């Protein structure tokens, strides 16, 4: 520190002496740019030394710290970006897996629905066929019973018609007709109606 003060005082002595000289000529123009004045020269030298000191201070101490902060920040940002890309890739994979699961579930559900529908159709067709066969049997049985009843009724009708015809002829004519003749006439009449 002391050395700096001594250098400062010694370098300003010529400028002070020049400024104190009453016979020094006055220059026209800007006094800051009057290099004939030793004070201006010393100011320029000191300004250069101060700028050099600032440059050295900034380049050796401040700029490396700023550079370190910038590098750390860039590394942090790149790490965050990598984490974000990884998270996005994981999310995309999860979404794709979920979409695949939904597609598989839809296909399985559709297959199950088709299986259930076809089983229901087959069961309904089987039940319809069984009902149809049962109804056909019942219809055939009913037709057989009807035919049997008709035959029985027709057989009874022949006897009743024969007896009734004999009774009517006997009442109308007062004579009993022959059994064979009445049965033959009743048979012809019934045959004509059937």
Swiss-Prot record:
GO MF assignments: proton-transporting ATP synthase activity, rotational mechanism; proton-transporting ATPase activity, rotational mechanism
Keyword Transcription: no
Tagged with keyword Cell inner membrane: yes
Protein name from the UniProt record: ATP synthase subunit b 1
Species annotation: Granulibacter bethesdensis (strain ATCC BAA-1260 / CGDNIH1)
Topology term for the membrane: Single-pass membrane protein
UniProt GO cellular component terms: plasma membrane; proton-transporting ATP synthase complex
Homology family: Belongs to the ATPase B chain family.
């Amino acid at each position: 520190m002391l050395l700096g003060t001594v250098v400062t005082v010694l370098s300003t002595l010529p400028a002070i002496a020049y400024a104190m000289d009453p016979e020094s000529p006055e220059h026209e123009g800007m006094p800051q740019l009057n290099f004939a004045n030793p004070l201006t020269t010393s100011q320029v030298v000191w300004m250069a030394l101060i700028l050099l000191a600032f440059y050295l201070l900034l380049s050796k101490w401040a700029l490396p710290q700023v550079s370190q902060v910038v590098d750390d920040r860039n590394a942090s940002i790149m790490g965050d970006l990598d984490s974000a890309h990884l998270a996005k890739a994981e999310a995309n994979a999860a979404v794709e897996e979920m979409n695949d699961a939904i597609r598989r579930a839809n296909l399985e559900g559709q297959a199950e629905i088709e299986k259930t529908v076809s089983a229901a159709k087959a069961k309904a067709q089987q039940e319809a066929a069984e009902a149809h066969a049962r109804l056909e049997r019942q219809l055939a049985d009913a037709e057989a019973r009807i035919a049997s009843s008709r035959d029985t009724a027709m057989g009874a009708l022949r006897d009743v018609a024969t007896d009734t015809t004999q009774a009517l002829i006997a009442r109308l004519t007062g004579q009993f007709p022959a059994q064979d003749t009445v049965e033959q006439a009743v048979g012809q009449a019934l045959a004509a109606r059937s």
